[in-house]
A protein has these predicted regions:
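Acidic, turn-prone loop/beta-hairpin segments
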Residues: 49-77, 109-199, 203-227, 247-250, ...
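Short cysteine-rich clusters marking metal-coordination/redox-active sites
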Residues: 274, 290-293
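Structured ligand/cofactor/substrate-binding pocket environments in proteins
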Residues: 4-6, 18-43, 93-96, 125-150
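Core structural elements
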Residues: 30-43, 63-75, 93-113
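Cys/His-rich microdomains that often coordinate metals
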Residues: 281-284, 294-297
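Short, intrinsically disordered, charge-biased short linear motifs at domain edges
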Residues: 259-266, 273-283
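Catalytic adenosine-cofactor/nucleotide-binding cores of aminoacyl-tRNA synthetases and other
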Residues: 4-59, 157-162, 208-209
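Short helix-adjacent coil turns
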Residues: 83-90
């Protein structure tokens, strides 16, 4: 109740009449759960992460990890500006959208497989990004969710110099990280992913597949789109789409989406389902594991 009320105050635009009601409080309770669950996912996946010894340098991170850090940096800039102008509603909505759109619906969904199945370096890259994002996120949310922020902070592994209480920490500073080419590249990747998601939803409706990991996606590309997507390792592209397999084909075909020069088709992936990662692979063994998961389990 207290948390819901504090979110109601923070989310309200005090320059106009403030509304209150059961539906509004219900929506805020759901928003709080989304923000809390975002933090819980990050905490749950850095349990074995020691920031003093396991942190990976930013230039060695996967591109999607750097994208997530840039997204968090943009959040920092927006929230700091909102707090400086006492615009708590703007800060709240920026934090909420970051949790739902950037983290839950995209980044955290994509890296789950890497956190559970990848080699040590790939996993540490994802953990590094999660750790850095969680530290900044907790500081940013503290002014409007002080008790939740302190609860999160108490579980975060501390580097030397970090305070016991989050309210004693300085707010994170937004860095100057303008990279138009990087931003344009990832905007294009996300647009392709959004188109593929729509085709996957139709394939589910047609009973071609159940979950997206049952899918093998063929992307029909013009020359420019082929070169763009072919520069991304196919296993990373499959992870971005959350499917078992991706093929690139030059030429027209499949269902057209909003992305220029791209057509898509979906079929059921070949092979059997790995009992650990749930991806379909023709090399799944008698133990029900794909070679990658068998290697992880030793």
């Amino acid at each position: 109740m207290c948390i819901r009320d504090s979110l109601w105050v923070a989310s309200s635009d005090y320059t106009v009449d403030v509304r209150a009601g059961k539906n509004i409080f219900k929506q805020l309770s759901e928003a709080y759960r989304k923000m809390r669950n975002t933090a819980r996912f990050m905490l749950g996946n850095i349990g074995d992460f020691n920031p003093a010894t396991d942190m990976v340098a930013e230039d060695q991170l996967f591109e999607i990890d750097r994208w997530a850090l840039k997204s968090c940096n943009s959040l920092t800039a927006n929230v700091r500006a909102a707090y400086d102008n006492y615009d708590f509603s703007r800060a709240y909505h920026a934090i909420y959208n970051f949790c739902v759109i950037d983290m839950s619906n995209f980044y955290m969904d994509v890296i789950k497989d890497r956190l559970y199945c990848a080699d040590e370096h790939a996993r540490r890259c994802a953990q590094t990004a999660l750790y850095r994002i969680l530290v900044d996120f907790t500081k940013l949310v503290a002014p409007i969710l002080c008790f939740t922020a302190q609860e999160i902070w108490s579980y975060i592994p501390k580097l030397e110099g970090m305070q016991e209480y989050v309210c004693w920490e300085r707010m994170p500073e937004a860095k100057s990280d303008e990279d138009a080419a990087f931003d344009a590249k990832w905007a294009k990747i996300i647009a392709v992913r959004d188109d593929v998601k729509k085709v996957l939803e139709q394939a589910r409706a047609d009973k071609t597949i159940g979950s997206s990991l049952e899918a093998a996606v063929t992307l029909y590309c013009n020359d420019e789109m082929y070169d763009f997507l072919n520069a991304i390792p196919m296993d990373e592209l499959a992870d971005l789409m959350i499917v078992s397999h991706v093929d690139l084909v030059k030429g027209e075909g499949g269902v057209r989406g909003l992305t220029e020069g791209l057509g898509m088709s979906v079929a059921h992936a070949a092979g059997n389902k790995c009992l650990r990662c749930w991806k379909f692979d023709t090399a799944v063994g008698e133990d029900g594991l794909c070679p990658r998961c068998a290697k992880v389990l030793g």
